[in-house]
Structures are given as structure tokens and as C-alpha cells.
Curated annotation (Swiss-Prot):
One of its GO terms (biological process) is regulation of metabolic process. This is Melanocyte-stimulating hormone receptor. Belongs to the G-protein coupled receptor 1 family. Residues 1-35, 92-116, 182-189, 264-276 are extracellular. InterPro entries: GPCR_Rhodpsn (IPR000276), GPCR_Rhodpsn_7TM (IPR017452), Melcrt_ACTH_rcpt (IPR001671), MSH_rcpt (IPR000761). GO terms for cellular component: cytoplasm; plasma membrane. The gene is MC1R. SMART domains: 7TM_GPCR_Srsx. SUPFAM superfamilies: Family A G protein-coupled receptor-like. Its main location: membrane. Coiled coil: none annotated.
Amino acid sequence: MSMLAPLRLVREPWNASEGNQSNATAGAGGAWCQGLDIPNELFLTLGLVSLVENLLVVAAILKNRNLHSPTYYFICCLAVSDMLVSVSNLAKTLFMLLMEHGVLVIRASIVRHMDNVIDMLICSSVVSSLSFLGVIAVDRYITIFYALRYHSIMTLQRAVVTMASVWLASTVSSTVLITYYRNNAILLCLIGFFLFMLVLMLVLYIHMFALACHHVRSISSQQKQPTIYRTSSLKGAVTLTILLGVFFICWGPFFFHLILIVTCPTNPFCTCFFSYFNLFLILIICNSVVDPLIYAFRSQELRRTLREVVLCSW
């Protein structure tokens, strides 16, 4: 996966010479600095699983008119973003395998153009995926705190504008990232975007969890059943931990990698961290696999429609 143009910088900082990197890496920690050799088959397998999962989500939402609402449209867009992550990963891996085995022989200029197209798709899907995770969090927040006004706040027109804005911004940002990938300011913007989404989700989901605990506590005190409060609080805490934990675990290492690229590109310990770049890509692809389980498959209506889709009862 090292052909990624903007992520080529991410993997091997342009302002650190190859010699400095290898020497620093060798002196920093020995064997554990050699990185992790991840087979292409794992990239292909995870990409295929994610592609199938997210295709099913999109098909189910399109099929069932009961799911034609802003909330499910946002989930559908997240599935499309994750699907693009999978497709770009599959294309990249297959492209590399065919070239490595001599099956595909292409001029270097064409390879660069194809590489840039795939890179743009990857960057756009990463930005849009992060964006729709934030949009879904905001949508859930409005659903809980402004339930009576939800349909007047989140109209179909506003939902369409939101989705179009995210896709447009993702396309523009990916183009800028591909063009100016050697500029640290671009990486800082990407890091800032991730931190903003992380803080946004933390604040919104914790506030929602606090409100849920308050409601359950008041109900249990009226019914004099503290067990209800403890059970519901535990379930809410588990859900919150899963939501934020998956987001942080899957995306955190990659963006921490970006932070190190900007702050210490030649530091021996940083170069050790850089050697695990493929692992961070695997975690991002894993996020595309897990997203449908968290945001889509928990809906009973969507699960029922998925069964119909799988059984081809259109």
C-alpha cells in the first residue's frame, strides 16, 4: 500500500532522508522497528467483507420506503463512503499484485495517473467517512434533545444539502491533499479535522448518555426499582464505549502517525512508529467493516429488510 501519493509522505516523511530513516530506525528499537508485514490477502479479504456489508446496507435502505428518512440517508452515505474505502483498497492491492507478478505492464506515466485517481478516491472516502460519522452523531443528538422539533429541524431538503456539502467538500479536500501532499499545513488541516470530529462525537455522545441516565434514574426512583437504572446505565455505557472506542482505535493510530510526521519526522522513535503504517491502514479498513454493525445492523427494520435482500425477495 506504499504507492499512495499523499500517504507515501505519511509513510516516509519527505523531509527525512532515506539514510537517516534507516539508521534511526535501526538504532531505536531493533527488531520491533522492522514494521509489520501484512499480506495482501488480508487487505483483499477485509476489503471484500466491507464491500459486501456496505452494499447490503445501501440495498436495504433503497429497498425499504420506511427507511427513506434523513437518519437512514446519512447511514447510507456512511456505507457508500466505507464502500469507497473498500473499492479503492481492493483496486490498489490488485493493481500492485498484478504489477509485482508481471501480469500488468504499464508505462510509468500511466501508473502515476492511475495512482493519483485511486489516491483521490481513498482520500475522499476517508474524509467523507469521518464527516458522516460526525453528521450521524449530530442527527442522533437532535433526535434525543429536540425530538418534537426533529422533523422541522432535519428536513429532507436540509439533509440533502448536508450530504451534498459533505461529498463536495470531500472531493475538493482530496484534490488539494493529492496536489499539495508535501505541505505540512495540509496534514495539519487533516489532523485538526480528525480532532474536531473526535471532540464533537465525545461531547455529543456523552451528553446523550448523561440525559439517558437522568431519565432512567427518574423512572427507576418513581417505580422504586434501582436495578432498572443500573442495567440501563451499564448498557448505555457499553454502547458509548463501543461507539467512541471503535472510532478512536481505528482512526487514532493513523492520525497520530500524521502528527509524528509533522512534529518529529527524523526522530528514531517516530521512524519506528512509521514502520507500522500498513497496520494503521488495516485498522481504517476494519472501521469500514465495523461501521455497519454499529450504525445499521442494530436497526430491527433494517435487519428485516436485509434478510429480504439476501433472499432476493425484491
